Curated annotation (Swiss-Prot):
Name of the protein in its database record: dTTP/UTP pyrophosphatase
Cofactor field: a divalent metal cation
Keywords: Cytoplasm, Hydrolase, Nucleotide metabolism
Organism of provenance: Alkaliphilus oremlandii (strain OhILAs) (Clostridium oremlandii (strain OhILAs))
Record bears the keyword Hydrolase: yes
Site (Important for substrate specificity): R12, T71, Q154
GO cellular component assignments: cytoplasm
Any Pfam family: Maf
GO BP term (any one): nucleotide metabolic process
Length: 192
C-alpha cells in the first residue's frame, strides 16, 4: 500500500484514521486559511482542503497519497473556529435550537501520478435549545475553542445534539465512508 500522509494537525482526524488501523503519517500544512466569501460553503471547504493537500504534496517526492480536509459549520453564514470565548458564545447561541450544516471538504492527491480528487460531505445537525448557563459552562471547558462552529460533537457538546442526518464522522472532521469510496474507486486503496 502507498504511504498515506494526513495533511492536518487535527487530533480528531488523526484519531479517525487510527481507528481504521491504517498506517499513515501526519504532516501539517503551512497554508493560511483564507475564506473566499464568493464561494458556496461546500466550495470553500473543498478549496481549503485542496490547498492543504497540495501544500503538503508539493513537499514530498515518492509514492505517497496525501489527504487534506477542512470542516466548516454553516447556519446563515460560515462559522469557523471562534477567536475567543465571546465569539464561541455567539456561535453557540446562534446554533441553539436550530438545524445547521456541517460540511467537510477533502482532497486526495497521489504524489507519483499527480491524480487529484476533491469532494465533500454534508451532515445536518439538530441542536437542542441551549440555556446561557449551558453555553457558558461549555465554554469554560475550553473544548469549543479549536473547533468549527465552537463545538465538538464527540465531546461534551454531544449533550446538545438531538439528532443528525448524514455521516457522524463528517461532523467530527473526516467523512470516513466517502473518503473510503474515493480511495477505493480512484486510487485502488482499500481501507479494510
Amino acid at each position: 500500500m502507498k504511504q498515506m500522509i494526513l495533511a492536518s494537525a487535527s487530533p480528531r482526524r488523526r484519531e479517525l484514521l487510527q481507528g481504521l488501523g491504517v498506517p499513515f503519517e501526519v504532516m501539517s500544512s503551512d497554508i493560511e486559511e483564507k475564506i473566499n466569501t464568493e464561494l458556496s460553503a461546500p466550495e470553500i471547504a473543498k478549496e481549503l482542503a485542496y490547498q492543504k493537500a497540495k501544500d503538503v504534496s508539493n513537499k514530498l517526492d515518492g509514492d505517497y497519497i496525501v489527504i487534506g480536509a477542512d470542516t466548516i459549520v454553516e447556519y446563515n453564514r460560515i462559522l469557523g473556529k471562534p477567536k475567543d470565548a465571546d465569539e464561541a458564545y455567539q456561535m453557540l447561541k446562534l446554533l441553539s435550537g436550530k438545524i445547521h450544516r456541517v460540511i467537510t471538504g477533502f482532497a486526495v492527491i497521489d504524489c507519483r501520478t499527480k491524480k487529484e480528487i476533491v469532494d465533500f460531505e454534508v451532515t445536518n445537525v439538530y441542536f437542542n435549545h441551549l440555556s446561557d448557563e449551558e453555553i457558558n459552562r461549555y465554554i469554560e471547558t475550553k473544548e469549543p475553542m479549536d473547533k468549527a462552529g465552537a463545538y465538538g460533537i464527540q465531546g461534551k457538546a454531544s449533550l446538545f445534539v438531538s439528532k443528525i442526518e448524514g455521516d457522524y464522522f463528517n461532523v467530527v472532521g473526516l467523512p470516513i465512508f466517502k473518503l473510503g469510496v474515493v480511495l477505493r474507486n480512484h486510487f485502488d486503496i482499500n481501507l479494510l
